[in-house]
């Protein structure tokens, strides 16, 4: 984490182009809805203070010990923004980091490789061009898009395996917890 933060801070403060890993503050409406849902369980979430993450830790700890509250961590996660890649340095809410990018795995993630290339360019004194800025913006958008597609594919595969497993239980009844309803 320290390497990721240090490189992000250097690149941001020197206004060099790169691909950042960003995580915006929670959407106030979603956080208010979560606070309302959690209230009957005894939790007092202040949606006007999303930076006070200790209030969320209380919910997570409490939900761990009460089967009736098992849905709360899932709903809390749904109220948060998804992390994404961007060519702007806007910080990472979940890590409480003002500067953040992915740097430590250039053989696994393309954004890390770009960060290495842009840092090398900065350290050797090469001039950055509009093409560098455009490439970072496009790579951020494409990396986020591909990450979301991979997540969707993973969810679909999980559903397929669950359905295949549950096929043997057709006709039986089970208790279930509903964590959301979609129309």
Question: Where are the predicted features?
Answer:
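Structured C-terminal cores of nucleic-acid metabolism proteins
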Residues: 6, 24, 29, 39-183
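Hydrophobic alpha-helix position signal
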Residues: 11, 36-38
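Short, glycine/acidic-rich hinge or "gate" loops at secondary-structure transitions
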Residues: 12-24, 127
């Amino acid at each position: 984490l320290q390497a990721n933060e240090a490189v992000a801070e250097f690149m941001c403060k020197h206004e060099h182009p790169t691909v950042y890993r960003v995580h915006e503050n929670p959407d106030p409406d979603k956080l208010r809805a979560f606070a309302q849902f959690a209230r009957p369980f005894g939790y007092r979430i202040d949606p006007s203070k999303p930076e006070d993450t200790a209030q969320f830790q209380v919910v997570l700890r409490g939900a761990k010990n009460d089967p009736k509250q098992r849905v709360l961590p899932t709903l809390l996660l749904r109220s948060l923004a998804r992390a994404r890649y961007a060519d702007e340095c806007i910080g990472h809410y979940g890590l409480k980091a003002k500067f953040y990018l992915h740097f430590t795995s250039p053989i696994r993630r393309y954004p890390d490789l770009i960060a290495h290339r842009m840092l090398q360019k900065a350290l050797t004194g090469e001039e950055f061009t509009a093409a560098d800025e455009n490439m970072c913006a496009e790579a951020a958008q494409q990396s986020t898009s591909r990450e979301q597609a991979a997540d969707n594919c993973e969810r679909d595969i999980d559903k397929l395996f669950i359905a295949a497993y549950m096929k043997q239980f057709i006709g039986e009844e089970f208790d279930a917890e509903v964590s959301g309803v979609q129309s």
